[in-house]
Regions:
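Helical "lid/coupling" subdomains associated with nucleotide-phosphate turnover
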Residues: 1-218, 223-234, 244, 255
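Short proline/glycine- and acidic-rich turn/helix-capping motifs at secondary-structure junctions
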Residues: 268-271
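Short, non-transmembrane amphipathic alpha-helical segments
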Residues: 245-265
Length: 271
């Protein structure tokens, strides 16, 4: 259960606080998840929260799993660390421990950049994190890699992303291992993410899947091929020496990626 960075509208938070503030101790004891040690103080805390929100008038309320410690932790960081995005820093460190291949996340990121030229800043951060975590389930059984990657990301103790962004990242890693965009296991994330987020996750996951097929996890190979969106086509541009060496799996991965973009897959050689 990940509460960190959970966000609700301020009015919704006030409504919940006012409801709890008028409950009796007996009623609170029957509520699931309410600690018996908090029963006496919970109504007063909710009353204080309601009054605080009435004065501050914020747009939303964001939960912090670190509490007051979050500011202390931040104050102890150097300037260079403060400048880093917390999700990218987390993904970089965790991904290094999970990674099987020598293929650098930066090589994957650079290879994908032309295809995602229209992404916004949030999507750029998620794409960076996804590249670092793209080998997260290599040691799981192939039949369960998509599911395990999805579950791991949903429960990662990672800062720097909202629940919607977490859902998008989890779907991305699921699609990286499996191409079915309607898998039942994705229901929770599909409900959390909006239409743009769902589309972005499917596109990025399919492109990551293609990248690993083309490179085999070896460094330096992705730089020999290019992936481009040209009019109504998703073009995989390969050197003439590779003509005839691309198998059916590569063609299917390209077709799946093109379908995510609503484009026609085309392999161009000798360009």
């Amino acid at each position: 259960h990940i509460i960190h960075h959970y966000e609700i509208a301020a009015e919704e938070a006030r409504a919940v606080a006012r409801l709890i503030a008028v409950q009796s101790a007996r009623s609170l004891e029957k509520m699931p998840g309410v600690s018996r040690r908090r029963v006496d103080t919970l109504p007063l805390a909710c009353l204080a929260l309601d009054r605080l929100l009435a004065v501050l008038k914020p747009r939303s309320v964001v939960f912090s799993a670190f509490g007051l410690r979050e500011g202390f932790y931040y104050s102890r960081l150097g300037e260079a660390e403060r400048a880093r995005h917390p999700l990218i820093a987390f993904a970089e460190e965790q991904g290094a421990g999970w990674r099987r291949f020598d293929l650098e996340p930066s090589e994957i990121f650079d290879w994908l950049t032309p295809v995602f030229a229209s992404e916004n800043e949030t999507e750029r951060v998620l794409r960076t994190a996804a590249c670092h975590l793209s080998d997260i389930s290599w040691d799981d059984h192939p039949d369960y890699r998509a599911e395990q990657a999805y579950v791991r990301v949903l429960h990662l103790p990672a800062p720097g992303m909202s629940h919607r962004e977490r859902a998008v990242l989890a779907m991305t890693l699921a699609y990286r291992y499996k191409s079915d965009p309607r898998a039942v296991m994705l229901d929770t994330a599909l409900r959390l993410a909006d239409g743009r987020g769902r589309t972005f996750a499917r596109r990025l996951g399919a492109c990551l899947r293609l990248a690993y097929n083309l490179s085999g996890g070896a460094p330096g190979l992705l730089t020999q091929v290019r992936l481009r969106r040209v009019e109504r086509e998703l073009r995989l541009i390969v050197p003439s020496t590779a003509n005839g060496s691309l198998g059916d799996v590569t063609a299917r991965r390209l077709e799946n990626a093109a379908d995510a973009f609503d484009l026609r897959p085309v392999i161009v050689t000798g360009a």
